[in-house]
Amino acid sequence: MANITSVSDKREIGINSFFSKVGFYISLLKPRVMSLSIFTSFVGMIIAPGFITIYEGALIILAISIGSGASGALNMWYERKTDLLMERTKNRVLPMGLISSNGALIYGITLSVFSIYLLYYVANFLSASILLVTILYYIFVYTIWLKKRTPQNIVIGGAAGAFPPIIGWTAVTGSISPEISLLFILIFLWTPPHFWALALYKSDDYKKAGIPMMPLVVGNKKTVSLIIAYSLTPVSYTHLRAHETVLALVC
């Protein structure tokens, strides 16, 4: 009887360990960031002039979400030592040693390749190419090159987060059109104030990690001014475009 209980306990521990591991790898995908990519790419698909089936649409969203998650995994792999220094990130799975760094790297690369191939298979070469550029841009331009070198890191690097609606659009149409530029610009302009607000709140964290976020370089007061300016710009831009549309309809 004792042996049966022991085997049962071991099986239960093994099952719990498996699901814990799955949870750790899911957290590497940065689900909250991934949800924004899913939403904006879906909007890009919906407003695109073209027709796709629900099945195709689901696979396109799946490919984009996997690509976004793969970027997050590779980002956390590269920043695993930096994350140890920050209160906000020290409890992530890599700094805590819950999964191996090699496992995270292989996971991120595998998902990247799979997402690009899946999008190419279900949609077209152009959308798959833009997804590839987005992943490479986020990892090499933002994470590796810009993040620890300039306070403009999120201004330039934020373009990576603005690509999903273009990917969704091109997955449906097979081409890039000026119409989708509005959504790209809105997300591009929204990204810096969002991260600067976080940097104001977590400036000590960024200082310890050696990341030159805007508040550490120009001070809180100027950062707040920049946040206001960047926040008002999209409003002004959309108002202008709406005004132009009304005039075009009237005339």
Give the residues covered by each predicted segment.
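The first (N-terminal) embedded transmembrane alpha-helix
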Residues: 30-44
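Membrane-embedded alpha-helical segments that form the functional core of polytopic membrane enzymes
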Residues: 47-80, 129, 136, 140, ...
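Interhelical loop and helix-boundary elements at the membrane-water interface
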Residues: 22-33, 93-104, 141-160, 213-225
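Solvent-exposed interhelical
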Residues: 72-109, 114-115, 191-235
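Functional transmembrane core segments of multi-pass inner-membrane proteins
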Residues: 52, 158-199, 203-204, 220-221, ...
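Short, Lys/Arg-rich, polar N-terminal cytosolic tail immediately upstream
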Residues: 4-22
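Conserved small/polar residues in nucleotide/adenosyl-binding loops
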Residues: 238-245
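Intramembrane alpha-helical segments
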Residues: 101-171
